[in-house]
Amino acid sequence: MKTLFLLALLALVASTTFAQYSEVGGWYNEVGGGGGSQQCPQERPKLSSCKDYVMERCFTMKDFPVTWPTKWWKGGCEHEVREKCCKQLSQIAPQCRCDSIRRVIQGRLGGFLGIWRGEVFKQLQRAQSLPSKCNMGADCKFPSGYYW
């Protein structure tokens, strides 16, 4: 019974933390690297290749069926996925790029109670470095504490 109570309490704390995070719209604009939410469209941008790049997924038609993650660490398609990401990112206004990247990866990062913390940190760093990897300016800056 105590275990059930503790699990319920833990779930409540986790959902409250997430609700507080969701209520703070535009929180990272003050940190820098992102531009204001008022200037950027609120719909989710088409950055599927960037999401694949950040999550280290290898999706290319020549490798069909999907060959991730084995080809990824061999360097098989990382370059192709990054190039597609850069092309998609170039279609977004410079002041909106970091906000768009953050919105695309926002629901993808994490793990229950920080179980995947090391992996999340690596993916977060990868996401933040996208603009510089694409020669489109400085890295984004996201407050990492909100993801775990």
From Swiss-Prot:
Do you know which InterPro entries this protein is assigned to?
Answer: Allergen/soft/tryp_amyl_inhib, Bifun_inhib/LTP/seed_sf, Bifunc_inhib/LTP/seed_store, Glia_glutenin
Q: What is the effect of changing residue 73 to R?
A: Found in hard wheats, including cv. Soissons
Question: Where does the record say this protein resides?
Answer: Membrane; Secreted, Extracellular space
Result of mutating residue 75 to S? Found in hard wheats, including cv. Buster and cv. Shamrock
The signal peptide, as residue positions, is 1-19
Which is one GO molecular function term here? toxin activity
Q: Which residues form the propeptide?
A: 20-29
On tissue specificity, the annotation reads: Endosperm and aleurone layer of developing kernels. In the aleurone layer, mainly localized to starch granules and the surface of the plasma membrane, forming a uniform layer, also abundant in the intercellular space. In the endosperm, mainly localized to starch granules and the plasma membrane, but less abundant in the intercellular space. Not found in roots or coleoptiles.
| Alphabetical UniProt keywords | Antibiotic, Antimicrobial, Disulfide bond, Membrane, Plant defense, Secreted, Signal, Toxin
Main location per UniProt?
Answer: membrane
* Post-translational changes noted in the entry: Five disulfide bonds are present.
Q: What are the recorded Gene Ontology BP terms?
A: defense response to bacterium
Q: Where are the transmembrane segments?
A: none
List, alphabetically, the GO terms of the cellular component aspect.
extracellular region; membrane
Q: What does this protein do?
A: Acts as a membranotoxin, probably through its antibacterial and antifungal activities, contributing to the defense mechanism of the plant against predators. Forms monovalent cation-selective ion channels in membranes. Has antibacterial activity against the Gram-positive bacteria S.aureus and C.michiganensis, and the Gram-negative bacteria E.coli, P.syringae pv phaseoli, A.tumefaciens and E.carotovora subsp carotovora. Acts synergistically with PINA against bacteria. Contributes to grain texture and hardness.
Entries under PANTHER family matching the protein: PROLAMIN PPROL 14P, PUROINDOLINE-B
What is the recorded name of this protein?
Puroindoline-B
Task: Specify the species.
Answer: Triticum aestivum
